[in-house]
Amino acid sequence: MQESIQLVIDSLPFLLKGAGYTLQLSIGGMFFGLLLGFILALMRLSPIWPVRWLARFYISIFRGTPLIAQLFMIYYGLPQFGIELDPIPSAMIGLSLNTAAYAAETLRAAISSIDKGQWEAAASIGMTPWQTMRRAILPQAARVALPPLSNSFISLVKDTSLAATIQVPELFRQAQLITSRTLEVFTMYLAASLIYWIMATVLSTLQNHFENQLNRQEREPK
């Protein structure tokens, strides 16, 4: 038992370094995924059916296939076409593309939940559709989308462990490498799992804080 604890202490710098990569991939994947997801959400709401169909096709592909397969096609498959990417950029692209598919549906549902009468009211005072979206619809939709998007981000933190399969030195990969040297399988994977749990707990606490702040603002008299 004492030896296992000492091993975890000795391995902690490597695990924390891996956790740093995990957070980088999570934040980057969520940021770029939200940007692309917003574009896809607008496409899903477009009155032009080919645009809607293209967005639905993209979302169907990335939600209907395993993330690990998407990562493999980017890292191992693209070199067949002369496109070679390092592990971290490959993981960032794969996570962003996958996140975008889920974020798009969340954002689309949030935008659609806003009363249609607000579009008419904004148009009646001379606001353009983009001004209406930016000033009236998006702030309200953001409140609706925050809880599911926060949950998606927490899931993304855990999903980054799949990047270990394409040699990204994130938290799970570091645990694998240490395990291969020490053969302490249970100890190292337990330590890695505890770090994932701590990160998820901190993020969940922040999510609850922001939601409470928003709810408090809504209850305050205008």
From Swiss-Prot:
Disruption phenotype annotation: Disruption of the gene decreases uptake of cystine. The tcyL-tcyP double mutant cannot grow in the minimal medium containing L-cystine as a sole sulfur source is completely resistant to both L-selenaproline and L-selenocystine.
Domain of life: Bacteria
SUPFAM superfamilies recorded: MetI-like
Keywords, alphabetical: Amino-acid transport, Cell inner membrane, Cell membrane, Membrane, Transmembrane, Transmembrane helix, Transport
Alphabetical GO biological process terms: cysteine transmembrane transport; diaminopimelate transport; L-cystine transport; sulfur utilization
Means of activity regulation: The TcyJLN system is inhibited by L-cystine, L-cysteine, DL-2,6-diaminopimelic acid and L-cystathionine, and is stimulated by D-cysteine.
Signal peptide residues on this chain, from the entry's feature table: none
Subcellular compartments: Cell inner membrane
Expression induction: Expression is induced by H(2)O(2).
TM segment ranges: 23-43, 65-85, 183-203
Coiled coil ranges: none
Keyword hit for Iron-sulfur: no
Cytoplasmic-facing ranges: 44-64, 204-222
Chief location category: membrane
GO CC terms in record: ATP-binding cassette (ABC) transporter complex, substrate-binding subunit-containing; plasma membrane
Residue intervals annotated with topology Periplasmic: 1-22, 86-182
GO MF term set: L-cystine transmembrane transporter activity
InterPro entries documented for this protein: AA_ABC_transptr_permease_3TM, ArtM/GltK/GlnP/TcyL/YhdX-like, MetI-like, MetI-like_sf
Membrane topology reported for the UniProt record: Multi-pass membrane protein
Family: Belongs to the binding-protein-dependent transport system permease family. HisMQ subfamily.
Job of this protein: Part of the ABC transporter complex TcyJLN involved in L-cystine import. This high affinity cystine transporter is involved in resistance to oxidative stress by forming a L-cysteine/L-cystine shuttle system with the EamA transporter, which exports L-cysteine as reducing equivalents to the periplasm to prevent the cells from oxidative stress. Exported L-cysteine can reduce the periplasmic hydrogen peroxide to water, and then generated L-cystine is imported back into the cytoplasm via the TcyJLN complex. Functions at low cystine concentrations.
Subunit structure: The complex is composed of two ATP-binding proteins (TcyN), two transmembrane proteins (TcyL) and a solute-binding protein (TcyJ).
Protein name in UniProt: L-cystine transport system permease protein TcyL
Organism (species): Escherichia coli (strain K12)
Lineage: Bacteria, Pseudomonadati, Pseudomonadota, Gammaproteobacteria, Enterobacterales
The encoding gene: tcyL
